[in-house]
Amino acid sequence: MNASSEGESFAGSVQIPGGTTVLVELTPDIHICGICKQQFNNLDAFVAHKQSGCQLTGTSAAAPSTVQFVSEETVPATQTQTTTRTITSETQTITVSAPEFVFEHGYQTYLPTESNENQTATVISLPAKSRTKKPTTPPAQKRLNCCYPGCQFKTAYGMKDMERHLKIHTGDKPHKCEVCGKCFSRKDKLKTHMRCHTGVKPYKCKTCDYAAADSSSLNKHLRIHSDERPFKCQICPYASRNSSQLTVHLRSHTASELDDDVPKANCLSTESTDTPKAPVITLPSEAREQMATLGERTFNCCYPGCHFKTVHGMKDLDRHLRIHTGDKPHKCEFCDKCFSRKDNLTMHMRCHTSVKPHKCHLCDYAAVDSSSLKKHLRIHSDERPYKCQLCPYASRNSSQLTVHLRSHTGDTPFQCWLCSAKFKISSDLKRHMIVHSGEKPFKCEFCDVRCTMKANLKSHIRIKHTFKCLHCAFQGRDRADLLEHSRLHQADHPEKCPECSYSCSSAAALRVHSRVHCKDRPFKCDFCSFDTKRPSSLAKHVDKVHRDEAKTENRAPLGKEGLREGSSQHVAKIVTQRAFRCETCGASFVRDDSLRCHKKQHSDQSENKNSDLVTFPPESGASGQLSTLVSVGQLEAPLEPSQDL
């Protein structure tokens, strides 16, 4: 047995007699020849032994105490032809017929045999007592190592798995998608990708309606319900649900924090505990140095005045730079609109497809994106989180608050480049630019009139197409014109004005209307020669022109002073002498039309209108008040004129 230093390692190709080249990459450990069972502590000596040509000699009967323990699971079941088992009190001998293996600590690398003849391998194990002291020692497994420098990939699933891994380095992608043309190095990746086109999501969550195309996405989703955060930072209490979030978080720590605070011991300890511990990522020394370098790397925008910073790599910075360069590589297939980011294009495509997946549970509103739905929900909750610090104003979104703050600062950032007009919001500027362009985009749906602004179109429709007579082709300018014209088609108005086409249902209303045609202007001003037909016009004149003079002479406001002849109060006093009382409830009125409106409330007495009116002759006393007992049906009540007229 040859012994040498244990600190060396080997990585390279080994030429075995017979023309077979085998890649070997092993860590320093005990190496056992699969033919003669000779042991080597040095890998170079073991390779030299294999190159010199191994023959089955007497060295195969080595001492049991120096032979590494190999369990029965070491030999694959498919390769075993005959197995004999002899159990003694000290040792256990297993004789198998199998290809040649190289056994090492926890690994086995398959080496092809030099001839087609089956070789008989005798494996001698340690005593049973010594094996019972280490029940946790895992059985040795057959593993293949990647030959590319720096790659630590190892597999125990044979050469096929190794070949799939090597496609990562070679870039070979033989599996192509028939729908989009995307290529994959593995067939199972293509199968998972095809679910994006077919929409098949076989992995469903038992807690909610979530469904995923692959099991890994479902496992990540389940951590949301369980609030499991297995990936923990060793520097601070931060914990995340997936490794990518932890990798981004580690960039926030500086190199000094990584060197001082990261513990040297491996977190995956072999000590047995009652409760299982959550896995913690422990970075190797090289990876920690790389992460420390990334932690100090902050990508800043190179444009003057821009303070954008990112720790998410160059891709995030490239997306930001498109704002300055104006590069919009993502173009819509239905319109000419372009976008700088692909996710913005995906959201824009919903405008053409009318897909609105985000629906309100309180009304029928549906939104294209979740942010629009959140803004809509604030209408139901009346939530106004954006508050002005200068006044009590509060808004539902930040854009409304930004526009409101311009009313305090007087800022008008949107200026017309053809004139000196300035505006607070961009929509006002767009409406203003239509004036310069002469464009009239708003067309009337009833005629050929076009307007530059929507407000002008609404005014046109209201004037020209709203106040239209239903019986003829008359078109009024406003509601008053239409009401005046509609009286021509009303045959149930017996009272008609002899001067115009006005008609009404009562004589009192006709008397009020007759003042329009009367040349007499009984209401005269005491301070000037102004006269009018209406008392309200006189009151407005005095209040507007002679307010100071009325205060100087200590005159009471019109309506509270003494009754003078010809005034509106005097006329009301005369009309009061013809009082109209309701027979049903006893209510009294000055005008008969007021009584008629009141009688409509008594639907059971509305048939006989003539019997509803009772006229009482006046009997004025010394004070000018009426105190005559009148009989209304079977009810006797004193009639007192109202003093509020």
UniProtKB/Swiss-Prot annotation:
List the biased-composition ranges (Basic and acidic residues): 543-554, 600-610
Q: Could you list this entry's UniProt keywords, alphabetically sorted.
A: DNA-binding, Isopeptide bond, Metal-binding, Nucleus, Phosphoprotein, Repeat, Transcription, Transcription regulation, Ubl conjugation, Zinc, Zinc-finger
Q: Which GO terms describe its molecular function?
A: DNA binding; zinc ion binding
Gene Ontology biological-process annotations: mesenchymal cell differentiation; positive regulation of transcription by RNA polymerase II
Matches recorded under InterPro entries: C2H2-ZF_domain-containing (IPR050636), Znf_C2H2_sf (IPR036236), Znf_C2H2_type (IPR013087)
From what superkingdom does this record's organism come? Eukaryota
Q: Which GO terms describe its cellular component?
A: cytoplasm; megasporocyte nucleus; nucleus
Please give the Pfam families that the UniProt record associates with this protein: zf-C2H2
Q: Where are the zinc fingers (C2H2-type)?
A: 175-197, 203-225, 231-253, 299-324, 330-352, 358-380, 386-408, 414-436, 442-465, 467-489, 495-517, 523-546, 580-602
Q: Where in the cell is it found?
A: Nucleus
Quaternary structure, per UniProt, is: Interacts with ZNF70; this interaction promote the transactivation of the HES1 gene. Interacts with NOTCH1.
Q: Name the job this protein performs.
A: May be involved in the regulation of mesenchymal cell differentiation through transactivation of NOTCH1 target genes.
Q: What is this protein called?
A: Zinc finger protein 64
Protein source organism: Homo sapiens (Human)
